[in-house]
A protein has these predicted regions:
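Short gly/ser-rich loop at a beta-strand->alpha-helix junction or flexible surface loop bordering the NTP-binding
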Residues: 1-7
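Non-catalytic interfacial helical region
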Residues: 19-21, 25
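Alpha-helical architecture
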Residues: 3, 15-17
């Protein structure tokens, strides 16, 4: 069992989910139903989130996600690293590339096809995704995984810092032309980098 998300990072807000990581020896649909029943009996069940997986399935997980999974999880019972496949630096690089591709596609698709209000509603999630990408890019560049947004912000420069700062400025109203343009140009630059 482990913990992820804002509770792990010390960034709990009024809308924060409680992200629990649970690995079950042999996960079944009955286990899922029982887990759901337990969660629904707890206070604030609507904030339950996280990662639930069978041990054998986790051992076969795509190495692309393992670097992020290990760094974004604090063990509380057992050792997650003993349950996952090995990963290489190339896997972490490909995780960043894949995530950048997905973010870029989301921005382009929403900007063209969504109403302006809907696009502005999508932007906070896009900036949140950028935070996770920045965490991993910073790790690849420095070997240090900054656990919190504030810690990462202190370590960033230039447009990277500008993107994370915008994510942190949740009180500032979202402005489509400004905020979509910043994230779009950041994605372009990151995707077209020759190396990570």
């Amino acid at each position: 069992m482990g913990l992820q998300g804002s509770y792990l990072r010390g960034e709990v807000g009024p809308d924060s989910d409680l992200d629990v990581v649970a690995v079950i020896a042999k996960l079944s649909m009955e286990d899922l139903a029982q887990y759901r029943q337990v969660i629904q009996s707890l206070p604030h069940a609507d904030r339950s989130c996280g990662f639930l997986c069978g041990q054998e399935e986790l051992a076969s997980w795509n190495p692309l996600e393992i670097c992020n999974l290990l760094h974004a999880t604090r063990d509380y019972y057992g050792c997650l690293q003993e349950l996952v496949p090995a990963y290489r630096r190339e896997d972490a690089v490909n995780y960043c590339k894949f995530s950048l591709n997905a973010l870029y596609h989301e921005l382009c698709h929403s900007y063209v096809h969504a109403e302006e209000a809907a696009m502005e509603a999508v932007l906070p999630g896009c900036y949140k995704m950028a935070f996770f990408i920045l965490q991993n890019l910073h790790y690849l560049q420095t070997g240090y995984f900054a656990e919190s947004k504030v810690e990462l912000l202190k370590r960033l420069e230039g447009k990277d810092k500008e993107v994370l700062q915008r994510h942190l400025d949740q009180e500032m109203p979202w402005q489509l032309s400004r905020d979509a343009a910043l994230l779009f140009s950041w994605c372009q630059e990151q995707m077209c980098r020759k190396s990570l």
